[in-house]
């Protein structure tokens, strides 16, 4: 069990998402950076899809009621176990009554707190993820707050302290063409890849809004019916400024879709900063389906290497 003493950010329970229900209008939800969540779980000898806490836009303070292995992945942060610094992509074991404090997220947006055995919350529609729009899943279907007691899956477990290779941060994101790609002007196809895009502050788990010097335009107006739009889809509304649909997106979209972020890059794209500093710049490039598959396979090899390292330290 962990007890949340203070909560300054937005935190909720997520696994890799809810699949197979979009035809009923039920969204995917799940971790914004699925690779980071899976890496943290494997570091703790959990199944990759074990539920963890996703935190953004602030920190928290919590205490453990028993010996509990834990780790952080995803965003980097300033964090302490009592008064000792702890670091992302390292495995630690907290003792009973120790306090874990995250003061701030320093690089990235989404921080994952994984614990041995995960968090014991009800499975709803084959997932532990919180659907914040619909108000179900996770812990009571809501954001976590001070005073919450979260049961954990393993009690009084001790694991040795080890680290794994962190996931790189990058603002160079790869795309594949989407269904209406050929309906955009040739200049727009070039602008998508050559123009510097900025992430707007009103971006969220539903979608990342982008702005650039020049807008994307169609060859001619389109009349479209809404159809399926998964995470990573880049829609272009009438103002010509793209919106990238993210984990909490609606199940369908009616704007023209110019491209889609490849699955391997979704987590890195999610970690790009929301401000007008140099760090908020994003650069896109179109890749082949073969390259998209190869990059996905590289992520799977990264997870396999974590399994090997953890197994070697048992």
Descriptions of predicted regions:
Residues 1-314:
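Conserved "landmark" site that anchors the functional core of diverse proteins
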